[in-house]
Amino acid sequence: MKKKVSFGESIIILVILLLILETAVIKFGLSPEVPVLFTVLLLTFWAKIRGFSWQDIQNGIKEGISVAIIPIFIFILIGALIGLWIQAGIIPSIMVLGFHLINGEFFLPSVFVVCSIVGVAIGSGFTTISTVGIALFGIGASMNANPALVAGAIISGAVFGDKMSPLSDSTNLSSAVAESELFAHIKNMMWSTIPSFVVSFILFWILGSSGQMDLTKIERTSSILQQHLVISWWAIVPIILMLICAWRKIPAIPTLFINIAATVIMIFIINPHFSITALNNLIMNGFVAKTSDSSVNSLLTRGGISSMMGTVALIISTLSLGGMLMKFNIVQSAMEPLVKYLKKPGCLITVTILSGICINLFVGEQYLSVILPGRAFKSAYDKIGLAPLALSRVLEDGGSVINYLIPWGVAGSFAASTLGVPVLAFLPFTFFSLLSPVFSIISGVTGIGLKWSKKPTK
């Protein structure tokens, strides 16, 4: 017979599911799609034994997937745009420019800073990674840089930009859930963001300065790009167009459609004989490089709607699992009893961050990792006198920035698919995401930068 899931039962279920996923992905090195589907199967068996109907199970899956319909469509458009940007010479032009401007010793910190600036301007980590990030990744490959290190710098910068931009969905969501004013929220995040940024920059500088540039390979790659693709200052037009759309607060889907249309026009201007059939194949299957250098071919052969299908499959599977966990109140049952025991700010902030990390692990969706802890712990923050700004900062530091570190998470799977580097490879080098929750906890324990709505009673 169906009944309320107890705290103990919910913890046991979550631990078992996490052990299965971690063993499969980390110990055996399996891609996460099949292990996630297996956990969905196990949870389905448990639900039937506990008296849940097939309708309950289907509703859980449906509700879980529904939160990702828009992101999935955005991923499809980004896949199309990547192939188009390479064909139009946009990404190759950025690479050639980067070869001339970026010093090898400062390459990694430069990547981190550039992606941070672009991320703040655009307000989207996904767009930053899939556009400028790909170009910078290509430059890194030509310099013989460690791909995982370059990916870590790109993602760290993109996460910083996504976190600090007033145009970012996750930033606006955290502010709204905690009921704090947006720009006050961004300002308050500096207490954890600036230390994380500075330490990340130093680490990238130290690690980047230890490598050696292969000048011959850089010159050869630059020459091949200029021989086989159009390198032009006109490549900046779609980038400027994207920035204009961002600052005019045009949503992601119309922004991507506008950019796709502009890039298609550029392609036909560059090559009037480019056929509709070739355009269709480019959008569907991505750009296929056919140069004399196999490493350049591997670097530029990417994009297309089909390149995102593996990511889409993983997202649907993960959010099906997350939807069932939510529908059966497993996640809620594990969180709710904690609230009444959290009376010190350090403990409350630490548990809030850990809750966000756990929801990222179990549900795989960054928005829910902000919403659920926000709803569960808001009353506890009010009770001990912490301001909404304290909660909104913690929701960002333990929620949205962590999703990029989860192999089966929406953001993590997207970054891995787009850059071609597994999550577990770039995870140790995504310093900004790793440090943000640490500095947030330090702030909570020490009281430095902690905002109060009323003075705590001693």
Where do the model's predicted regions map?
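Short, amphipathic, aromatic/basic-enriched membrane-interface segments that mark the entry/exit
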Residues: 1-9, 98-103, 119-125, 222-231, ...
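Hydrophobic transmembrane alpha-helices of multi-pass small-molecule transporters
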Residues: 1-70, 193-199, 208-314, 455-458
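C-terminal transmembrane helix pair
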Residues: 5, 11, 177-193, 197, ...
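Alpha-helical transmembrane segments in multi-pass membrane proteins
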Residues: 13, 17, 35, 39, ...
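Membrane-embedded alpha-helical segments and adjacent helix-loop junctions characteristic
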Residues: 51-141, 292-378
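Transmembrane-helix bundle segments that line or gate the permeation/cavity pathway
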Residues: 153-154, 159-162, 166-167, 197-213, ...
